[in-house]
């Protein structure tokens, strides 16, 4: 008689039989498309998602998300983590919660780089604050820390740093500047999860920080993001803002309790109403609905177990691909790790001596099916949605980030077949 499997066992059995990795290059043939990144999932992520749908108690954020938040906090040495539906949402929640907690006023200032992904800057503008731009330096492509103090005014409240593809600026200087001028150091860590500074996680230096779980990032839940801080009150503000602005913080089965997590679910919560209301419908902030699905939390738990392997491969492949490029392509420079840092690389950043070299090298790679990316926006002030914020011409190095810089992947999905093909394409440059 054969073995009889229940439905949960059947899901696990079928997934193990059918899925090694959802995406992989095991059968790669030279000339096939090479993506710059993508999620590395196997049957564990798939079965976690399916089992959460079939047997979980919640569709929206519930017990799996709560478990993921706890495990994530432990892995990245932070007291509190709150999951949202994207890294961009995480940035929006972070800035909105900072404004609320510290009572920032309209036109208060946040220092940022003009080069990077737009949703580092957009939440500042959306909250009625003013981004103060610092031109980049060309060694690391981060904003030039030496220029920051010249831009600080009585309205400056924070520095919001986004390490370039995982590679940070001089963090000691940033901490000193923040301490000297009573500023808050914040991190957009979406591209740099796991980056170290002097042997410790770079995120240890931030008051609050974010990360992204988009498929291209270090771990992926499909879409998703996290807001992190050691300040519980700040995280409570972040949670409220991403949960419609409500005051209630019940999760999972606690939603069903008559007394709720707080013990006073039905009480006199409103100053101007003499009656009992449900705490679940008390709104202390103007908020959004930025909640993830519980299956994303389940996937995140499995991805977190793979993080050390994923990060190690990114570091290894960045160094290998850097050597391929520098050995074969003249007029380009791959960005090295900043002194005192050990980046968790998101990609391989390439600075070209001229715009012509960049355009020809990008065309060469794309023609040979190796995916490239601009360094995101380049100077964001050149773009229609942002050009009103400042004069792009003032930021000459940032303009070079658009004309002379791009990146390729160092994806943990790669294998020796893919790496060998990338080397061949680099060697063909001189044919």
Language model features by range: what are they?
Residues 111, 132, 185-186, 210, ...:
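Structural detector of well-ordered beta-strand residues that form the stable sheet scaffold
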């Amino acid at each position: 008689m054969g073995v009889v499997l229940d439905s949960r066992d059947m899901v696990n059995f079928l997934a193990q039989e059918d899925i090694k990795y959802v995406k992989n290059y095991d059968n790669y043939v030279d000339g096939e498309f090479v993506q710059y990144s993508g999620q590395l999932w196997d049957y564990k992520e798939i079965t976690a998602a399916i089992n959460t749908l079939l047997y979980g108690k919640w569709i929206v954020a519930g017990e799996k998300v709560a478990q993921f938040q706890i495990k994530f906090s432990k892995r990245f040495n932070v007291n509190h983590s709150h999951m949202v539906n994207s890294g961009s949402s995480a940035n929006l929640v972070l800035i909105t919660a900072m404004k609320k907690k510290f009572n920032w006023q309209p036109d208060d200032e946040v220092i940022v780089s003009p080069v990077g992904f737009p949703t580092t800057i957009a939440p500042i503008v959306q909250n009625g604050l003013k981004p103060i731009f610092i031109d980049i330096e060309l060694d690391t492509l981060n904003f030039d820390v030496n220029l920051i103090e010249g831009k600080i005014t009585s309205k400056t409240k924070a520095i919001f740093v986004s390490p370039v593809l995982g590679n940070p600026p001089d963090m000691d200087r940033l901490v000193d500047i923040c301490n000297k001028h009573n500023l808050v150091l914040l991190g957009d860590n979406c591209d740099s999860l796991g980056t170290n500074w002097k042997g410790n996680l770079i995120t240890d230096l931030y008051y609050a920080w974010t990360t992204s779980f988009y498929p291209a990032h270090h771990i992926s839940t499909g879409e998703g993001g996290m807001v992190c801080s050691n300040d519980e009150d700040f995280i409570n503000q972040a949670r409220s803002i991403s949960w419609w602005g409500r005051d209630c913080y019940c999760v999972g089965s606690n939603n069903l309790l008559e007394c709720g997590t707080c013990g006073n679910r039905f009480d006199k919560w409103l100053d101007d109403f003499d009656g009992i209301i449900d705490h679940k419908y008390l709104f202390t902030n103007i908020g959004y609905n930025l909640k993830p699905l519980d299956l994303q939390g389940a996937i995140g738990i499995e991805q977190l177990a793979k993080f050390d392997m994923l990060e190690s491969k990114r570091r290894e492949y960045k160094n290998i691909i850097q050597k391929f490029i520098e050995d074969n392509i003249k007029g380009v420079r791959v960005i090295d790790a900043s002194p005192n840092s050990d980046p968790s690389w998101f990609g391989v950043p390439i600075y070209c001596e001229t715009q012509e070299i960049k355009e020809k090298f990008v065309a060469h790679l794309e023609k040979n099916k190796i995916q490239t990316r601009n360094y995101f926006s380049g100077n964001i002030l050149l773009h229609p949605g942002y050009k009103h914020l400042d004069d792009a011409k003032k930021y000459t190095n940032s303009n070079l980030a658009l004309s002379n810089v791009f990146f390729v992947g160092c994806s943990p999905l790669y294998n020796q077949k893919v790496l060998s093909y990338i080397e061949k394409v680099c060697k063909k440059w001189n044919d």
